[in-house]
Amino acid sequence: MSIAVNMNDPTNTGVKTTTGSGSMTGSNAADLQSSFLTLLVAQLKNQDPTNPLQNNELTTQLAQISTVSGIEKLNTTLGAISGQIDNSQSLQATTLIGHGVMVPGTTILAGKGAEEGAVTSTTPFGVELQQPADKVTATITDKDGRVVRTLEIGELRAGVHTFTWDGKQTDGTTVPNGSYNIAITASNGGTQLVAQPLQFALVQGVTKGSNGNLLDLGTYGTTTLDEVRQII
């Protein structure tokens, strides 16, 4: 914002002003408005009688301070709304504690209890498709990269789908306890599609980070709410 003062006018009181394209800002809208009015009064007092400030110029300068004040109020309002949204998201995130979620990842855990007759259980796995597929295949490998099972899932619609592996290898034997990897391929009419594998994780807590609320997934680290594809 600029307010011109005739620097050669002998009645110039020495009020600090800006000329040309310079700008002046206050710490907030109230300070800026006070400074603006002070300078405007000084300009009116010190204006050249042969070239007085025109009404349209005065209107323009008053409109400028109104705009700045309005923007300051708008920023305050937006800040309050943003805070309410953050609080709402924090509350939403805390409701997930203790729940299982499907997030992007390739891990399946297999385990069998020590008691007699216990069966092997596995964590769910899933896939997210942006387009429908007429052929979807899941390949499970062990920590050494050896294929232990290939699952022909078949046709799937676009969206998120969740499955459970029975923990058996191709030969029908049960896999040892441990961590396994899942790779998923999808195609439609012979054209390869993007297939995002999903892994299961248990939400153990919620923390606040620079990117917002973070879900604590234990050994899987942390993730944002945006990464959650399904709640189980």
Curated annotation (Swiss-Prot):
GO terms for biological process: bacterial-type flagellum organization. InterPro entries: FlgD, FlgD/Vpr_Ig-like, FLgD_Tudor. Transmembrane segments: none annotated. Belongs to the FlgD family. NCBIfam families: PRK06655.1-1. It comes from Salmonella typhimurium (strain LT2 / SGSC1412 / ATCC 700720). Required for flagellar hook formation. May act as a scaffolding protein. The gene is flgD. Keywords: Bacterial flagellum biogenesis. The keyword ATP-binding does not apply. Gene3D superfamilies: 2.30.30.910, 2.60.40.4070. This is Basal-body rod modification protein FlgD. Residues 11-26 have a biased composition (Low complexity). Coiled coil: none annotated. Pfam families: FlgD, FlgD_ig, FLgD_tudor. Residues 1-26 are annotated as: Disordered.
